Amino acid sequence: MPISTPALLVHTAGQAFERGSVERRDVGPNDVLIDIAYAGICHSDIHQAREEWGRAIFPMVPGHEIAGIVREVGADVTKHAVGDRVGIGCFVDSCRECENCLAGEEQFCLKGSVATYNGR
C-alpha cells in the first residue's frame, strides 16, 4: 500500500512552494523509510525549482539534505534499525566499485549515482 507523505511541492517551474502530499511506494527489501524531521533547501534546490538547469522533473519536492528517524527497514537492510537517527546527503548510492567511487567521489560514479532529489 503506498505511503502518503506531507511535503512542500513545486508543480511547475518558478511556482511558489505549496503544501501538499506525495505518494511513496511500499518499503522494498533494501529501503529505509524515514520520518523526516528536517530538510534543508539550498540554492541548488532553487535552481531546480526554477528549471534553470534544464533537467527538472515536476511535481518536485525541493530539499535534499535530510535528518530524521528510521520508521521502517526492508528485510535485507542490516546497517539501520527502527528508531535510529539518520542524516542523508545529496547522494545515497553508487556502484562503490569504479575508480571514482573508490577515490571517495561517489557523485562522479562512472556507472551512475543515485541522488535524493529530482528523480535523477
For the regions a language model picked out, list residue spans one by one.
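Glycine-rich beta-strand-centered segment in the early N-terminal region that forms part
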Residues: 25-39, 52-99, 107
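Residue-level signal for short segments within beta-strands and strand-turn junctions
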Residues: 9-12, 50, 70, 102
